[in-house]
């Protein structure tokens, strides 16, 4: 009966989590490595660090510490591969803790978005169809936000007809 179309934008913002990024890396002479870090995704950290430092993922054990909140900002790596590389070179454990200033300058904020939404509904207000186009300004470092946005755009509604599209702009 009715079609409503709206456009929305969100700005890039930093998650503002409580504790800064910190890690402790230890690489032994036989190439095995241990990494303790503040993360929301130790398996992603293991895979990224192994690829960046050039070691087998099976040789890297990542232990996630308790975090006070990450809000999606602690799912990737910043200092962890550096600590691993330095530990391998020094033959000793290496600890890196970012200052609050370093966190805001050197870690990634959420990306900004431009979203167009089109919703079909009955005159009684029941939503019958929904469509969304999401454009993320990920720049040179696109992220997994596309998947999360397209999967959750209308997840709260029981709809028979849904279409979501997303791209990095």
Predicted segments, located by residue:
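Structural alpha/beta core scaffold segments of enzyme domains
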Residues: 1-169
């Amino acid at each position: 009966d009715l079609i409503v179309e709206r456009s929305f934008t969100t700005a890039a913002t930093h998650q503002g989590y409580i504790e800064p990024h910190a890690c402790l890396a230890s690489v032994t002479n036989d190439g095995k490595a241990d990494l303790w870090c503040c993360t929301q995704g130790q398996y992603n950290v293991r895979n990224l660090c192994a690829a960046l430092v050039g070691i087998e993922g099976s040789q890297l054990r990542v232990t996630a510490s308790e975090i006070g909140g990450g809000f999606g900002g602690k799912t990737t790596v910043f200092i962890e591969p550096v600590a691993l590389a330095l530990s391998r070179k020094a033959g000793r454990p290496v600890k890196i803790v970012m200052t609050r200033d370093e966190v805001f300058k050197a870690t990634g904020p959420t990306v900004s978005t431009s979203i167009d939404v089109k919703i079909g509904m009955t005159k009684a207000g029941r939503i019958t169809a929904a469509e969304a186009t999401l454009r993320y300004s990920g720049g040179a470092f696109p992220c997994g936000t596309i998947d999360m946005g397209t999967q959750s755009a209308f997840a709260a509604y029981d709809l028979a007809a849904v279409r979501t599209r997303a791209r990095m702009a």
